[in-house]
């Protein structure tokens, strides 16, 4: 890992961090085959909230090819979850249509 740098996450890091999330999203293995229709899905669910709601506790690992890792945290898990539910989740849900048809067939 020569030439790697740990730094505070900043605006614009989402695509790189989401990509890392996808590439490790199948039990640590590449999840790209599972999320072909929406490669950013895992990142929007698991990475985006921290980058947005807890930026001061969001770090990324950079190398010469871009973001290759991250460490994310929340100072207060209960407060973070409350903000996730009131701020992040509604935006996420609003971006996608409700499924149609018989719910037993989803």
Predicted regions and their residues:
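A short beta-loop-alpha structural element at the N-terminal edge
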Residues: 5-19, 75
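Alpha-helical elements of Rossmann-like donor-binding domains used by nucleotide-donor carbohydrate transfer enzymes
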Residues: 16-20, 45, 66
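Conserved beta-strand in the GNAT
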Residues: 60, 66-75
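Helix-loop element at the rim of GNAT/NAT acetyltransferase active sites that forms part
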Residues: 19-36, 49-50, 79
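Conserved acyl-donor/pantetheine-binding loop and adjacent beta-alpha core of acyl/acetyltransferases
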Residues: 77-106
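Short strand-connecting beta-turns/loops that link adjacent beta-strands
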Residues: 11-12, 64-66
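Active-site rim helix/loop that mediates acceptor-substrate recognition in acyltransferases
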Residues: 36-58
């Amino acid at each position: 890992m020569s030439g790697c740098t740990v730094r505070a996450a900043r605006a614009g890091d989402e695509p790189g961090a989401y990509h890392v999330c996808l590439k490790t999203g199948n039990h640590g293995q590449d999840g790209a085959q599972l999320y072909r229709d929406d490669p950013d899905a895992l990142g929007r669910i698991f990475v985006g909230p921290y980058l947005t709601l807890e930026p001061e506790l969001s770090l990324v690992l950079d190398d010469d090819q871009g973001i290759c890792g991250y460490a994310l945290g929340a100072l207060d898990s209960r407060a973070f979850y409350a903000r996730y539910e009131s701020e992040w989740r509604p935006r996420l849900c609003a971006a996608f249509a409700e499924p149609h048809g018989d719910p037993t067939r989803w």
